[in-house]
Amino acid sequence: MAQEQSYPTIWKVSDNLWEIIKTLLEEFDPPASTGRPRHDRRPIFNAIIHRLRTGCQWNQLPKEFGDDSKIHRVFQHWVKLDFFEKIWAALLTECEELEQVQWKWQAADGWLGKARMGGDKIGPNPTDRAKNGTKKSLLTDGVGGPLSIVIAPANVNDHKLLEQTLNSIVVERPRPTSANPQHLCLDKGYDNQMSRQIVKKHRYRDHIRRIGEEKIDEQGQNKHPARRYVVERTLAWLSKCRGLLIRYEKKSENYLAQLQLACALLWYRRLIRAVGSIT
């Protein structure tokens, strides 16, 4: 069996990706018609990716990226424009046009993380001696591509974020039909009536299993392949970004923007697998 080609970790904006981002900048953040010419935004975007990967403080960014205070100002400006979510949506849309989004099977799960600096949307983490933390709730397609992500205090139960997560898909979700149903896989944290009602309301077929409760046939084999693991795999990949592993941002919207950027980069990797090139 041929192995899937692997691509290096994205540390800077490729030419292809920059063309997509530049088009979005022209639409949502065009330069002013008067005043001094605007500085090149590409090094600034590279700096934001570097910070996402390393988790360094803004004032510790390498000098090659330019003035750190200017980089931070531009980042804050883009956060207010929801620009990182727009990049995510644009890349997901391109993948969908290439039939690279697997809507039939989806999965959702939550992920707890530390929040060192305080701020909004934090709460006592029940798995970390009640220290401050933030919860992320993620929805993925059938192979782990992120479709939506929301954040909340760490002490909010997963199932209480389910409806917000399903409402936050960054592109229009195809309407499920009897011929083309959509399935949603959830773990035991969603094994309650409220979650089942939400799943039904959003026209999914629910697959909520307790640990060790997978269906088996007469020979003791699983009837259906495990599908929930894809969201756990994506959460594990996101935790490799040191800027996401521990939240240092006091403003939740700044932390969410970095999560959105990481999700966008995952779709870009799928896009280059589909077209077979990266520059």
Question: Can you describe what each PLM-predicted range is?
Answer:
Residues M1-T279:
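Short alpha-helical elements
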